[in-house]
Amino acid sequence: MSQSAVSFQISPVSKTQDPLIQQKIDLKTKPPGALGQLESLALQIARVQATDSQQTDQPQNTVLKIVQPTMLVFAGDHGIAAEGVSIAPSEVTRQMVQNFAHGGAAINVFCRQVGFTLEVIDCGILTPVEGVEGIIDQRLGAGTGAIHLEPAMALETVDKGFAMARDLIERHHQAGCNLVAFGEMGIGNTSAAAAIMAAIMQLDVIDCVGRGTGINSETLERKLMLIELALLLHQSALTGPKSVLACLGGFEIVQMTGAMLAAAERKMLVVVDGFIATAAALVAVQIAPNVRDYLIFAHQSDEQGHKRMLEFLQAKPLLSLGLRLGEGTGAALALPLIQASVNFYNQMASFSDAGIEAVV
């Protein structure tokens, strides 16, 4: 299987009906712009759903819908974690995957609260969880290579991960889902995400690396050094976004990237969580720039490089809560705001409907 074996055909959203969509938003019973970011979000959702339905006129009559919102949590282990770059050992990845399956993690609580269906995907943790229902096996290996010593994986593995992710998204699309959100679990994956960020954005490592879920200063110095070694080791091989994933990524980051591309290909809305998920989005946009039209960025995390990545992607996140957990928690918490955008667009009266003089 070659590097180009899996490709995605992603249409840009149509903006030809923007004036009519914006007019519908502006004529609601409120001053123009008074609902702030919810208005720009409604415009984005209307663009995506108008593109999906291939409507050519009357977008003001379109009813926006969020159908079967689904949270996909991708899990994988990282070779670099053996060097102690995180507050927890790699075994915790497996333990947390079990916790997800048993419904006891933060992401389970939030998904139940807001109405997300949750699926957990084993992309390649060190030891698979057996005898527990609710974990989807999409294993690409038993943890990646240690990126400061060797490539994380082969290029062929990236394509295999993309193909698995496409099949996963296709299953949900066929079931009627039109919004997917992505979370992750993988001890050491902030190191991989920071390395990806540095490689793609051409930044110094110190501008990309943070404390993850709470490492001390000594561990942070080790993390910086190892990521710098990784970038130096693979410098000549970093020739494109897929090679960046192969050299520096994680199995869960690969499958998140592929799932974002596949969802956009199917004109589904994609809710991006925190630092790790945004690194996957960064790669996805390099592969297919049109994917950006479909991405909703849930929050700005407490990881110091996240703000830079969001700015690079010209993304304005919906929330800023100081989160640094991952799992898709920020994406889950953003769903009520996304639904609020849909609801005001569909249900608010216009000035003429309400018999109110328009506010200019």
From Swiss-Prot:
SUPFAM superfamilies: Nicotinate mononucleotide:5,6-dimethylbenzimidazole phosphoribosyltransferase (CobT). The active site is at E327 (proton acceptor). One of its GO terms (biological process) is cobalamin biosynthetic process. Keywords: Cobalamin biosynthesis, Glycosyltransferase, Transferase. Its EC number is 2.4.2.21. InterPro entries: Nict_dMeBzImd_PRibTrfase (IPR003200), Nict_dMeBzImd_PRibTrfase_bact (IPR017846), Nict_dMeBzImd_PRibTrfase_N (IPR023195), Nict_dMeBzImd_PRibTrfase_sf (IPR036087). The keyword Disulfide bond does not apply. It holds the Pfam family DBI_PRT. It is an enzyme of class 2 (transferase). It catalyses: 5,6-dimethylbenzimidazole + nicotinate beta-D-ribonucleotide = alpha-ribazole 5'-phosphate + nicotinate + H(+). GO terms for molecular function: nicotinate-nucleotide-dimethylbenzimidazole phosphoribosyltransferase activity. Pathway: Nucleoside biosynthesis; alpha-ribazole biosynthesis; alpha-ribazole from 5,6-dimethylbenzimidazole: step 1/2. Catalyzes the synthesis of alpha-ribazole-5'-phosphate from nicotinate mononucleotide (NAMN) and 5,6-dimethylbenzimidazole (DMB). Belongs to the CobT family. This is Nicotinate-nucleotide--dimethylbenzimidazole phosphoribosyltransferase.
